[in-house]
Curated annotation (Swiss-Prot):
Protein name: Uncharacterized protein WxcX
Record-linked InterPro entries: RgpF, WbsX
Domain of life: Bacteria
Membrane-crossing segments per the record: none
Length: 695
């Protein structure tokens, strides 16, 4: 078949698929029937699904990492121990993939020594901001044949609040694959973390999704196989650490509609367990491909399995491609979280699920399905709201949340520590169990903090004078170059000022140090910051006047208490800057258009319009919660250009113009200091003196 013929055939199939989908959506069907028909069609005709829209190629500047793939990002969290309360509000059950050890079958199908790590380590970023390869941190590229690996996993899971692992169990008509880790967990008395099994009852296919015709090993369901299966897993269910609902062992099935007779299968299992000393069991299925009422198929409960069964909007077209041939699909993970956390529970037993991200590019090179913009904080909020709200009326035995997943490294669903963010996902899991989902917005003076970047030390005293003389006690954090820490420390000691001093590499001007500190302060529940820096603008002859005007507006007598109070009483106030220095982004974009485009795409924010404002000079009051779109992007220091005295066109200059966009994207408002103080000021008719408008 010629290339032209294939193209015509593909277009015809895409058109027919669109017609079928439109008709399918208007037919009145129950969710269960709709899901079953969809699965039937995709199992047989997955190649009919049109390719997603392509991203953008040939952008001006490449922002692909060039040095290394294991750099810690803003938001990296180190291991830390924090005591958990004796009673947790829910049992968290994380799905666990046992594919991290070689077996003869995988050797034959994928090559000698294959484990999931081979997929993980070969992956390349497909677009700018695509965080691949994702590499493990403290646990390394582990081999599950080593017992200490699973012991360490169990210890970490318990320290960070997880209540159980749910192991995928692979059974093919009497043949098991990847069972060794489960057997090891079952037998190791030093491991006390409970576990349960989920029978992944799909065929294995070379596509990695249980679909397609290139089958590696198939299922052969029958009544005899039902009995052989339950007899095999019974030894695990007899284990005292096997997870129970009440006193009933919990057994999951991944795709119940692949069972020819699920009602009869469930009955056979129950009867066998009653007759063989197990007693009653609790049967649940995973809502990965279908959503029947579990009672209709002889089961007791269902388990949500995000990101499956969700349709967040595609953001593929916005992406700045690294691989111009990338034909995968990029979706907005934040919309997945927003949708799932608001879903009501059903009138049957449904265990809610959460997900810390998804990216199966390692298994589908150049064609991955990627859920972008996942972040530990937003995952924490999703999990906390699920526990606090969705489970509010659940009986104690049913207060379970399933997490997809503990270690799906080749599908980007991972709680284990990674090189980029460390223990951030585990830390977020623990926080979700120990703090309210919505932090109080009331602000008082002790929660307001000054973050001052000191590069020009000859004006540091002037700025410290302004802080001290404002009349309001403020926590002071001074960032500076690593070579200037001692001199800054001597300055504050000489003045008798209480301040914290932090040294950073001279990269990213005042912006990168501020992002590091702001990220930490947000985790400490500090709500409000005043961002300052020792601005001189040595390429100008009026840099001192620029700095002086902003200090007067931001720290003038009797202003600080009033500004803090204004933020406290107006929860939508996100950023306040001096009125004379709050400018339209589009009129002062300078040489920053490409970097600004990168930031809007990287954070999933809207491009600037005529109403978008920025604080020229980068000094302002800000609610840290309003900066989350920027902080939750987890930028790397290496993305900031090395210091060469640039006066425009760097990522730091672009972020100066982007901060206001982040604030509005978070749902907050950019305003002026004067408006927060109730001061009416006549706008100046003179051109802005400290920057030129874009031509």
């Amino acid at each position: 078949m010629s290339t032209l013929d294939r193209s015509i055939q593909a277009r015809a199939r895409a058109h027919l698929f669109g017609l079928l989908r439109a008709g399918f959506r208007v037919i009145p069907l129950s969710d269960a029937t709709r899901d079953r028909w969809r699965s039937w069609f995709l199992d047989r005709h997955a190649d009919w699904v049109p390719e997603p829209v392509r991203g953008r190629a040939n952008h001006a500047i490449s922002r692909r990492p060039t040095a290394r793939s294991d750099e810690a990002a803003i938001g990296h969290v180190a291991y830390r121990t924090i005591a958990l309360p004796e009673t947790l509000p829910a049992t968290l059950v994380a799905f666990y993939l046992p594919q991290f050890h070689p077996i003869p079958e995988n050797d034959a199908w994928w090559g000698k020594g294959f484990t999931e790590w081979r997929n993980v380590s070969r992956t390349l970023p497909q677009f700018e901001g695509h965080q691949q390869p994702r590499l493990p941190a403290d646990l390394g590229f582990y081999d599950l044949r080593t017992p200490d690996v699973m012991r360490e996993q169990a210890r970490l899971a318990q320290e960070y609040g997880l209540g159980a692992f749910c192991f995928y169990f692979y059974w093919f008509a009497g043949k098991t694959l990847l069972e060794m880790p489960i057997t090891q967990w079952h037998a190791d008395t030093s491991i006390t973390l409970p576990f349960c099994l989920c029978w992944a009852n799909e065929k294995w296919a070379r596509r990695w999704d249980g679909r397609g015709h290139d089958v590696l090993i198939d299922q052969a369901h029958s009544a005899d196989d039902d009995l052989a299966f339950i007899a095999h897993v019974a030894r695990y269910m007899r284990n005292p650490k096997y997870l129970r609902v009440g006193d009933r062992p919990l057994l999951l099935v991944y795709r119940p509609h692949l069972l020819p007779e699920p009602v009869q299968t469930a009955a056979r299992w129950r009867n066998w367990c009653r007759d063989n000393g197990i007693g009653e069991i609790h049967l649940a299925y995973v809502q990965g491909f279908e959503r029947p009422d579990p009672r209709d198929i002889g089961f007791d409960a269902a388990v949500e399995f995000p990101p499956n069964m969700s349709t967040p909007p595609s953001v593929t077209a916005r992406q700045r491609l690294v691989n111009p041939d990338f034909s995968g699909d990029v979706l907005d993970w934040r919309e997945l979280a927003r949708d799932m956390e608001q879903r009501p529970l059903r009138d049957y037993t449904l265990y809610p699920g959460v997900n810390p991200g998804w990216d199966n590019e390692p298994r589908r090179s150049g064609k991955g399905r990627i859920y972008l913009h996942a972040s530990p904080r937003r995952y924490r909020d999703w999990l906390a709201r699920t526990v606090q709200h969705r489970l509010a009326n659940a009986p104690s035995a049913h207060r379970m949340v399933f997490i997809n997943a503990w270690n799906e490294w080749a599908e980007g669903a991972v709680l284990e520590p990674d090189a980029r963010l460390g223990y951030a996902w585990l830390d977020a899991t623990r926080q979700a169990l120990t703090r309210a989902p919505d932090v109080a917005t009331e602000i008082c003076s002790p929660s307001a903090c000054v973050v001052l970047h000191a590069w020009y030390l000859d004006v540091l005293d002037e700025m410290l004078d302004a802080i001290v003389e404002c009349g309001t006690p403020l926590r002071i954090i001074i960032t500076t170059d690593l070579t200037k820490v001692i001199e800054v420390t001597k300055c504050i000691q000489r003045r008798g000022i209480q301040a914290e001093v932090e040294g950073f590499e001279n990269r990213g001007r005042d912006i990168l140090p501020f992002l590091h500190v702001a990220n930490r302060l947000l985790d400490e529940n500090v709500q409000l910051v005043l961002k300052l820096h020792t601005k001189k603008s040595t390429h100008r002859d009026d840099g001192n006047a620029w700095r002086g005007e902003m200090l007067t507006a931001l720290l003038g007598p009797q202003r600080v208490d009033a500004i803090v109070n204004a933020f406290s009483t107006d929860p939508l106030a996100g950023l306040a800057a001096p009125e004379d220095h709050l400018l339209p982004v589009t009129e002062f974009i300078g040489g920053n258009a490409d970097a600004l485009d990168y930031l809007t795409v990287r954070t999933g924010s809207d491009a600037p319009d005529t109403n978008s404002l920025f604080a020229s000079g980068s000094m302002f009051w800000a609610r840290l919660e309003a900066l989350r779109p920027l902080l939750d992007a987890h930028l790397h220091a290496s993305e900031f250009e090395s210091e060469q005295g640039q006066i425009d066109g760097t990522l730091a200059h672009a972020i100066e113009r982007f901060v206001g966009l982040a604030v509005t994207h978070s749902g907050h408002r950019v305003t002026t200091v004067e408006q927060t103080l109730g001061i009416t000021k006549t706008p100046s008719a003179q051109p802005y003196r400290y920057a030129r408008k874009a031509p």
